[in-house]
Amino acid sequence: MTKSYQEINAETIDRWVEEGWEWGQPISHETYLNAKNGNWNVLLTPVNPVPHEWFGNLKDKKILGLASGGGQQMPIFNALGGNCTVLDYSDKQLEAEKMVAEREKYEIEIIKADMTKKLPFADNSFDIIFHPVSNSYIEKVEPVFKECYRILKKGGILLCGLDIGTNYTVDEKEEKIINSLPFNPLVNEEQRKQLEEQDCGIQFSHTISEQIGGQLKAGFRLTDIYDDTNGFGRLHELNIASFVATRAIKE
């Protein structure tokens, strides 16, 4: 039986984590203690930290980390008093969450699930959804935003890190534009070969219309936005944005 692209991506990310992928390295005990003392930052995108005012007071808030495994953000939210749940499709990313929770002796609900399917939560379940860059690993993003709207409480906050497509236009050295958009390896064999050669799993470009428009169509009100770079490489050196982070509210 042929593996789904979602399964291929989960296995790819598991392998990256074993190889030392930066987004799969859990925070240290010291970082956790610092967060308990009010010294903390988290990332939705590679470089610029999320403004603290985007969150408000997290004490006793129900927080979902959507495709947010790895033991980097959820431990911080726990240290700040949040009641946390994490959903991811990578076993290794979820193992990191379990490891930090056991080390720091806190409880977190850990769920392995595919975010392209109906999310396994009741309506109006969460105060905040934290969704760092990850929807570049799924083909259709609008259904995810609809599900986020469904499971957030009224007044709930959706925080997203979004790849805006620039990365998919350029070659590996980021010197030449080699691809048209949309980048979709399920329909473009040449793009699939590029990903296989670079061990990048199955990735997809998404437009601003899909991503911010998708949030608005789901019913959210956008309240803030900032852009960000890759953190390394030629596009970063030229200060060319590849990502945006968004804050939206369910009214």
Q: Can you annotate each of these PLM segments?
A:
Residues 61-118:
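Class I SAM-dependent methyltransferase SAM/SAH-binding core
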Residues 27-61:
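Conserved alpha-helix/loop element of class I SAM-dependent methyltransferases that forms part
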Residues 202-225:
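Short alpha-helix
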Residues 157-190:
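Conserved class I S-adenosyl-L-methionine
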Residues 218-220, 234-251:
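Core SAM-dependent methyltransferase catalytic element
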Residues 127-142:
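A short SAM/SAH-binding and catalytic strip from SAM-dependent methyltransferases
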Residues 116-128:
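A short acidic, Gly/Pro-enriched loop at the edge of an enzyme's catalytic core
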Residues 142-157:
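A short glycine-rich, Lys/Arg-flanked "PGG" loop and its adjoining helix->strand segment in the class I
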